[in-house]
């Protein structure tokens, strides 16, 4: 049972000929659960194939609760969310020393609401790295709210279409040109927005972990080693 609107169909090419395949994009939760229940009763193995990392915008909790109620056991497998696939494509580090040590994963409110305390403005006020999902159709509003929250209009941003797919397209822009960039390249959905100075990674501090003067559990820093010799 795969999320047909998001899962790359190439992932289904390795299935056995007798495998029953269901596209959950055309199904309700109840229909998905009935397929699972029936298959379990028949002793079959079921794969519920989500996109990216299921724990992020995957609507998996309601499925797990229902399976628990039915007494059907299951295992969860971790995946790679779009924000991490995009970081790999763009060679980004979200947590650059003295630039940002936090990554905020969020979305604009659409037909699925967002708690008021989790507004784009409140998150933008932190000036941390942000990965914004499910908001491609609201980029003008997103830009306004990011700027209202504290980001300057020229803050670096990236628009990543279909991260990790063969069709992936990456565009570096700014907070104020997100909508313009999407329109120019015909991007209307299935894109991730990344915001923050880490996108351009122009100025940051060297990490302490590999600094020769820094002592860790595994090695003594040069400064401390010199001090010990003097003692």
Question: What feature does the model see in each segment?
Answer:
Residues 1-77, 179:
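Class I S-adenosyl-L-methionine
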Residues 5-8, 20-30, 80-82, 101-102, ...:
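Short, acidic/turn-prone active-site loops that include or flank metal/cofactor-
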Residues 6-8, 55, 82, 138, ...:
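Alpha-helix capping/helix-boundary segments
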Residues 10, 86, 142:
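Residues that scaffold the ATP/ADP-binding catalytic core of kinase and kinase-like folds
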Residues 42-46, 65, 102, 110-231:
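A contiguous loop/helix-start segment that scaffolds small-molecule binding in enzyme catalytic cores
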Residues 53-126, 166-172:
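Class I SAM-dependent methyltransferase SAM-binding "motif I" and its flanking Rossmann-like core
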